[in-house]
């Protein structure tokens, strides 16, 4: 049986977070009434000329610096010619032969797949280019009986199209790359990353070939995937479709396909064009884009500390694992919150802080559907909870209860943990005499478990610990209970 290799390349459109459009002064606000944010340039009225938005260029430079690419000292804009109702000029202003960002790399963390028995691993994805272009308008098919409405609010919105080499070999790798790219553009402040509003969307080029074959198979492009789940589902379906088609004696056709999330399948949209079909030529209305070293240095000076550098610093400074550091730097807000907690709780509590952020904190955020920057528990409040675990005042179980109380109360006092501990009498029982008395009662009431433990059943010991913790309503120091039980059971 033929073994197949999957080949995936992604083209990602990141909408740049400028106040105005790339070639006009019209606003870029999302959700306005149709055609209220389109000026004569966007409408392609006769006699108007495009003027390049400097802010869009600076955001492209920032991205290029972050991925270690070459910033072209001279790049040009081209007209990409095609007809579509929401493209009033009859062409899109883009970059073709000389893009502003050339090359670069993004390192991704691919999670383990326990079902397939595959461990987690790291991979570097090479980028071909990233170029500036304008977005098209939007066709509206609802509310127009038998007709299509055109909304040109989006026309002219600045995009950075980011293109990878065809180096990804599974949907899992493609999703890991898309998530890493999404986190990076949001981190850099060049894109808000709102996938529901179309600020970040992917086109996936998918093909298959027999393992060991160098020649690429015929690719299909799946357009406008605006969620990581859809990206994964669409690629997996397309891979199955192509393999089944070839094994049944058919041929894969080069085409553009759309993903139907309701049916969880891709369907043909149109035949896929090649570059020559668009008849690219330099836009005569725009001067070449010249970027001097002084401009690059000014942008570099304003760059934030990058996720990769912070990850390494977290590993070196706080002793967290590389994987944990990756999770903690999944967003700038998460990294800042972690460092704020550690600053209050002390570096000695960095690992427990990391575990809490990836565990209880993330769980509560998901439950409430909010991001870390909207968390109702301040870094100082969480730090105090962790300090009380460290100094033995409370157990980890009680700490979870206190954290949940602070969260639900939306408490504002920095000393909320101590207040709740005192009000509810939650201090951990660490007095040896008191614990011994409780353990004696537990042993007397659970003679069967004692016999089973002495007969070699380790599970019985855990049952006794559970009974002791139950007797103290979770307030006993678990480590002391463990030691005292072992001592008494000989």
Swiss-Prot record:
Q: What is this protein called?
A: Aspartyl/glutamyl-tRNA(Asn/Gln) amidotransferase subunit B
Cite the NCBIfam families for this sequence: gatB (TIGR00133), PRK05477.1-2 (NF004012), PRK05477.1-4 (NF004014), PRK05477.1-5 (NF004015)
The record, for Pfam families, names: GatB_N, GatB_Yqey
Q: Which Gene3D superfamilies does the record associate with it?
A: 1.10.10.410, GatB domain, N-terminal subdomain
According to its UniProt entry, the function of this protein is described as:
Allows the formation of correctly charged Asn-tRNA(Asn) or Gln-tRNA(Gln) through the transamidation of misacylated Asp-tRNA(Asn) or Glu-tRNA(Gln) in organisms which lack either or both of asparaginyl-tRNA or glutaminyl-tRNA synthetases. The reaction takes place in the presence of glutamine and ATP through an activated phospho-Asp-tRNA(Asn) or phospho-Glu-tRNA(Gln).
User: What keywords sit in the KW lines?
Assistant: ATP-binding, Ligase, Nucleotide-binding, Protein biosynthesis
Q: How does it assemble?
A: Heterotrimer of A, B and C subunits.
Its GO biological process annotations read: glutaminyl-tRNAGln biosynthesis via transamidation; translation
Q: What class of enzyme is it?
A: ligase
Q: Which reaction does it catalyse?
A: L-glutamyl-tRNA(Gln) + L-glutamine + ATP + H2O = L-glutaminyl-tRNA(Gln) + L-glutamate + ADP + phosphate + H(+); L-aspartyl-tRNA(Asn) + L-glutamine + ATP + H2O = L-asparaginyl-tRNA(Asn) + L-glutamate + ADP + phosphate + 2 H(+)
Q: Specify the species.
A: Burkholderia vietnamiensis (strain G4 / LMG 22486) (Burkholderia cepacia (strain R1808))
Domain of life of the organism in this record? Bacteria
GO molecular function per UniProt? asparaginyl-tRNA synthase (glutamine-hydrolyzing) activity; ATP binding; glutaminyl-tRNA synthase (glutamine-hydrolyzing) activity
Instruction: Please give the family membership noted in the entry.
Output: Belongs to the GatB/GatE family. GatB subfamily.
UniProt-listed SUPFAM superfamilies: GatB/YqeY motif (SSF89095), Glutamine synthetase/guanido kinase (SSF55931)
* E.C. numbers: 6.3.5.-
């Amino acid at each position: 049986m033929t073994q197949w290799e999957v080949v995936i390349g992604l083209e990602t459109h990141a909408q740049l977070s400028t106040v105005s459009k790339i070639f006009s002064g019209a606003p870029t606000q999302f959700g306005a009434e149709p055609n209220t944010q389109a000026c004569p340039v966007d409408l392609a009225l006769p006699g108007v000329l495009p003027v390049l938005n400097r802010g869009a260029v600076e955001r492209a430079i920032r991205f290029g610096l972050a991925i270690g690419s070459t910033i072209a000292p001279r790049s040009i804009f081209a007209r990409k010619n095609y007809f579509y109702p929401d493209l009033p000029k009859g062409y899109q202003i883009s970059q073709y032969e000389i893009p502003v960002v050339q090359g670069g790399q993004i390192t991704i963390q691919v999670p383990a797949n326990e079902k397939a028995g595959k461990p987690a691993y790291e991979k570097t994805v090479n980028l071909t280019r990233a170029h500036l272009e304008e977005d098209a308008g939007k066709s509206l098919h609802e509310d127009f009986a038998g007709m299509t409405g055109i909304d040109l609010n989006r026309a002219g919105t600045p995009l950075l199209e980011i293109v990878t080499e065809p180096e990804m070999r599974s949907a899992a790798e493609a999703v890991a790359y898309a998530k890493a790219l999404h986190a990076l553009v949001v981190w850099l402040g060049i894109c808000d990353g709102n996938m529901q509003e179309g600020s970040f969307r992917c086109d996936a080029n998918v093909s298959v070939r027999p393992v060991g074959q160098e020649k690429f198979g015929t690719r299909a492009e799946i357009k406008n995937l605006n969620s990581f789940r859809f990206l994964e589902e669409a690629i997996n379906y397309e891979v199955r479709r192509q393999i089944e088609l070839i094994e049944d004696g058919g041929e894969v056709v080069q085409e553009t396909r759309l993903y139907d999330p309701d049916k969880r399948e891709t369907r043909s949209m149109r035949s896929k064009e090649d570059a020559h079909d668009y008849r690219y030529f330099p836009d005569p209305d725009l001067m070449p884009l010249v970027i001097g070293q002084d401009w690059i240095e000014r942008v570099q000076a304003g760059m934030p500390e990058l996720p990769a550098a912070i990850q390494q610093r977290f590993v070196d400074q706080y002793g967290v694992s590389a994987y944990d550091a990756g999770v903690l730097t999944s967003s700038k807000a998460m990294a800042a919150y972690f460092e704020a907690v550690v600053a209050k709780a002390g570096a000695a509590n960095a690992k427990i802080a990391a575990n809490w952020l990836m565990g209880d904190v993330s769980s509560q955020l998901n439950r409430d559907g909010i991001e870390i920057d909207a968390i109702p528990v301040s870094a100082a409040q969480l730090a105090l909870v962790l300090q009380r675990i460290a100094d033995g005042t409370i157990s980890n179980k009680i700490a979870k209860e206190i954290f949940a109380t602070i969260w639900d109360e939306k408490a504002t006092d920095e000393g909320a943990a101590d207040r709740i501990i005192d009000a509810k009498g939650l201090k951990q029982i660490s007095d040896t005499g008191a614990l011994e008395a409780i353990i004696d009662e537990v042993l007397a009431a659970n003679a069967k478990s004692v016999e089973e433990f002495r007969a070699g059943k380790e599970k019985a010991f855990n049952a006794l610990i559970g009974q002791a913790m139950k007797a103290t309503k979770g307030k006993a120091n678990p480590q002391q209970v463990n030691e005292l039980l072992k001592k008494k059971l000989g």
